[in-house]
């Protein structure tokens, strides 16, 4: 049985369809083709499917699926021919629309950091073909990331470091390319093949590295 997390999302690849379920993350079973719902557990985790195509709302990401305070923003009109009408954007502005750093001259560093809500993957295993997938676009109708400055878009998974602590592991990253047209839409799929990911409060996060002093170095994500 195959499952797929489509951006930013988890879903069953036997019924693979084009929806960003990590920007969706989309993971579903034949009997679960529905919106993700919270499970009443002590950790208050989400069940799969986990799906978000960013077409039903604008502004801050939905706190049912995403942790608050990320700085990432859902908008209509910033992507160029995206799969759905809404897209998730990353730049150098925080959740209040202010620069992360307005004191320095063109400061660089980690800007928006979007964490998924905890997802219960304990019922599944690496041999069940679970994956996270999404479409991404460099720039769109925003300001272009800078190849020379090492601007990048990064996906990380949360894994146990010790019995009581966790760490974030980079599982996918792309650096800005000056030769990539701003309307190019690319697809990413990250297979969950490590047993360390299959626990009851799995999380993934998406972050960007770029200029921290304004609405610069835009990256677009959709399902």
Please annotate each region the language model reported.
Residues 129, 138-174:
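Extracellular ligand-binding interfaces
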Residues 107-113, 144-148, 199, 210-223:
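Extracellular carbohydrate recognition
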């Amino acid at each position: 049985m195959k499952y797929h997390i489509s951006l930013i999302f988890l879903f069953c690849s036997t019924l693979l369809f084009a929806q960003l379920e990590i920007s969706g993350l989309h993971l579903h079973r034949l009997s679960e083709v529905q919106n993700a719902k919270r499970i009443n557990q002590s950790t208050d985790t989400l069940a799969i499917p986990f799906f978000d195509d960013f077409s039903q709302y604008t502004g801050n990401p939905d706190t049912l699926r995403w942790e608050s305070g990320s700085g990432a923003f859902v908008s209509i009109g910033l992507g160029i021919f995206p799969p759905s009408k809404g897209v998730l954007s990353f730049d150098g502005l925080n959740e209040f629309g202010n620069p992360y750093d307005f004191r320095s001259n063109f400061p660089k560093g980690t800007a928006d950091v979007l964490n998924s809500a905890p997802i219960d993957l304990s019922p599944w295993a690496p041999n069940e073909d679970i994956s996270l997938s999404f479409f991404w676009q460099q720039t769109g109708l925003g300001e272009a990331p800078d190849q020379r400055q090492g601007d990048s878009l990064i996906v990380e998974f949360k894994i146990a470091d010790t019995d009581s602590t966790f760490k974030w592991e980079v599982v996918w990253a792309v650096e800005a390319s000056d030769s990539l047209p701003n309307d190019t839409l690319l697809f990413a799929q990250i297979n969950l093949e490590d047993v360390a990911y299959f626990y009851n409060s799995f999380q993934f996060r998406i972050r960007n590295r770029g200029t921290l002093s304004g609405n610069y170095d835009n990256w677009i994500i959709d399902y």
